[in-house]
Amino acid sequence: MIRFALTIGSVVALLATGTAGAADSNKVLHWEFRAAETGFDPGRVTDYYSNTVIEAVFERLLTYDYLARPSKLVPEAAEGMPQIGDNGKTYLFRIRKGAYFAPDPAFKGAKRELTAEDVAYSIKRHMDPKNRSYWQWLVDGKIVGLDELAQKAKVGVTGLDYDARIPGLEVVDRYTIRIRLTRTDYNFTYILAMPAMSIVAREVIDAYGEDSNAHPVGTGPYMLTRWARASKISLEANPSYHGFVWSFQPGIEPGDNEIVARMKGRKMPVIGRIEISVIEEEQSRWLAFQRGELDILLLPGTFAPVAMPGNKLSPELARRGVTINQLIDPEITYTFFNMRDPVLGGFAKEKIALRRAIAMAYDTAEEVRVVRKDQAVEVQSPIPQGIAGFEPSNKSGIAFDPAAANALLDKFGYRRGADGFRTLPDGAPLVIKRWSRSGDSEARELDDLWSKSLKRIGLRMETVTTKFADLLKMSRQCQPMMASAAWIADYPDADNFMQLLSSANIGQSNYACYSSPEFDRLYSAARQLPDSAERNAIYREMNRRLEADTVWKLGVSRVRTMLIQPTVKAYKKHPILHAEWAFIDMERER
C-alpha cells in the first residue's frame, strides 16, 4: 500500500560508492535454471528465468531491501523515494547522478549516463504496438497521455513517437521525472520495482532492433558476456556500475544478525562472475550440486526426502557444511481451462459442469505428498500467503470429490461408452488435451497424476508436450485446452494475482482467456481501494465468481528450499527479488 507521506528525503538503503572495483573475478557463483530463458529485453519477456538475469543487468527506479520482511521498497536508480502528491496520482523522482550503462558498441565509444529521458522511454516501450509487450497491463490506462500516444501509433505508419512529450511522463530536467497517473494506483511504486520496468537505453534498442533480447545493456551490477541459448549464461561485474555500500539492517528472522556482521560496510558487489547452467532434469541438478558444480540449488522435490529427512538437513550435507534457507514462495500454481476452447470453454451449464468435474477429480493433497514431497502447501484462493489481501480463513469451494464429479458428469449427459470413457452430450468423442512442458521429470509426474485423476471420472486425457518458452507463447494465444502454470509475486499485493483473470490481459497474463463483465467490474472496483477490509470483501466476491465459472483449478505454493554450499556467505532468499547475487559474498575459486 502506498504511504503518501513518503518524501525525497527518505533513507537510501543502497548507498552509492562511485566504483564497482570491489568485484573479484576469482569469485565465481555457479547457479542453475530449471527451465530455459527466453531473452533479456525487459519489455519482451515474462518468464522467471529471463527476469532473474534482467534483474541483475538493469536497474529500476526502486528495488527491495535485502533483509526487511515484509518486503520493503528502497531506491535503486532513484536518488531517494519519490515525492508523492495529488492523492497518489503524481510521483516526482530524482535520478541518481553517475549511473552509467555498461560499455556497448551502440554508444560508439562514449560513456552513457542514465537520465530521466531513459525512464520515460522505457515506460513508453510497453505501449508501443510494435513491441507487443506482455507487460502492457502495468501502464495501460494509467499514465496521462500515454494511451493517446499509443493509439496514434496504432493508426499511423511511423510507429510510436518516442520524442513526443506527454503530461504523464514529464522530464523536468536531466535527472528529474514527474509521473502523472490518470487515477490513484496504490501499487504503482511496487510496479516501478518490477524487472519489466528496468531502464534501458534507446540507442541500444535502436541498434539491435528485433535482436534486443540478445543484447541487454543496463546500469546494474552485472553484464551479459556469453549466452548459449537454453544452455549457458555468463555474467560479469559491470565495470561501469556505481556500486553501493552494504548497509541493510537486520530483520527479525534467524541469521540476519550474522549476515549484517559479515557484510556491513562492504563495497558491493564482490562476486565477479555468475555462471548459470540450464539443467532441466531434477536428478542432473541434484548431482551437479553434490559434485560441487553448483553453489546454490533450489532443492528438487524428488530429493527432498534425501536432503531433508524429517524436514531437517541430512547429517551428510551438514557434515559438508551445506546450509539451507527456506520460505514459502509468494506464489500460486494453477491449472487453467481455455475459455475459448470449443470442448472445454464457454459459459454453457454443461461446459461449466465439465470443468468443475475435472477440478473436483484432482487431488491436490496427493500432489503435495507424492510429487512435491511435502515441499508445498495447498492454496485456497488466488491470493497466496505473504501477500496483502491474503485471508487465512478463505477456503476453496471446489474440494476433491470424485464421486460428486462423476455424478455431475452423469447429470449433464457425459455418458460412458463401452470402453469406460465418456462422450460429449451429443455422443461425439471426448478427449481432454492437457499441455505440459517437456524435459522435466516433475512435469511428467504431474502429467501422470492428472491422467489418473481424469481416468477416475471416465475422461480420456492426452498430453501435449512442448518447450517451456513455447508453452508460454501458446498460452498467450489461447491455444492449449488446459495447462498448468505458476505465478510468483512481482509485488506483494493481491492485485498482482487478480490481474491474471482480467479480460484486459487476454494475450498477456490471462492464459485462461477468461472474459467476465462481472469479474472485470469487481476487479476495477478493487483497484480503486487500498489494502483494506473493504477491498478484501471484493476479492472474496471475485473468488466466488471464479469458482462459479470454474476457470482454474488452484494448486499450491511451493516451499523454496535453497541448499547453499559452505563457500557462499550471507545468502538469504528474498520473497520478491530473483537475483540476490549483488548482496552476497563467497570464497574465491581455486
Task: List where the protein language model places each region.
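N-terminal secretory signal peptides that target proteins for export/translocation
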Residues: M1-I2
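Non-catalytic accessory/assembly modules
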Residues: W135-V157, Y162-L192
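Sec/Tat signal peptide C-region and signal peptidase I cleavage site
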Residues: G18-A22
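Bacterial N-terminal signal peptides
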Residues: A5-A16
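N-terminal lobe/hinge region of extracytoplasmic solute-binding protein
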Residues: E32-D86, V217
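Extracytoplasmic/periplasmic ligand-capture domains
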Residues: Y66-L67, T90-L92, R96-R132, R165-L169, ...
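Residue-level recognition of beta-strand termini and adjacent short loop/turns
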Residues: G85-N87, D173, R229
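Active-site-proximal polar cores
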Residues: G555
